[in-house]
């Protein structure tokens, strides 16, 4: 008598979706960010095999665009930049940009290059340092990779600004 029964009873018909957009009819997510964080995880803990597997999984779920959030932060960078090395940045142990572009090409994806962040804007509020550095970064990256890989899709401007931004 009433034991073991849930009240009120739910019938199969009551479990229909109440979604505004019908299932499998919404906008698909086809792009994602590669969070290089060049002085932290994941890239220092992952080799090319792990990245390849990640790209395989992304491709399998419909990702066709990968965007590297930034190409470097302060003295850490994702590729061997002649310009940034002269400015005191550290030589990376792996050329992540080349690896990402090769994997993007292998899985028929487009890769977008996130610009360099010197950290000076965060220290001073003056954006002109970032603009000047990235003029050189863009030119050298295009020569090193843009002309070489069909997967190179363009640029991602990763800088953050506010009404108080100078420069």
Q: Which role does the model predict for each range below?
A:
Residues 116-122, 138-166:
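Active-site groove signature of glycoside hydrolases
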């Amino acid at each position: 008598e009433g034991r073991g029964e849930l009240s009120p009873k739910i019938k199969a018909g009551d479990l229909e979706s109440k979604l505004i957009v019908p299932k499998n009819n919404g906008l698909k997510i086809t792009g994602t960010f590669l969070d290089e964080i060049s002085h932290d995880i994941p890239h220092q803990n992952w080799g090319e095999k792990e990245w390849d597997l990640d790209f395989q999984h992304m491709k399998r779920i419909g990702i066709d665009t990968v965007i590297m959030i930034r190409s470097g932060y302060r003295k850490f960078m994702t590729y061997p930049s002649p310009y940034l090395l002269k400015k005191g940045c550290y030589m990376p142990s792996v050329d992540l940009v080349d690896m990402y572009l090769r994997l993007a090409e292998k899985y028929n994806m487009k890769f977008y290059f996130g610009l360099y962040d010197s950290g000076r804007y965060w220290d001073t509020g003056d954006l002109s340092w970032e603009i000047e550095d990235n003029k050189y970064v863009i030119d050298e990256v295009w020569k090193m990779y843009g002309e070489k890989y069909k997967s190179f899709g363009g640029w991602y401007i990763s800088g953050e600004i506010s009404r108080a931004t100078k420069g």
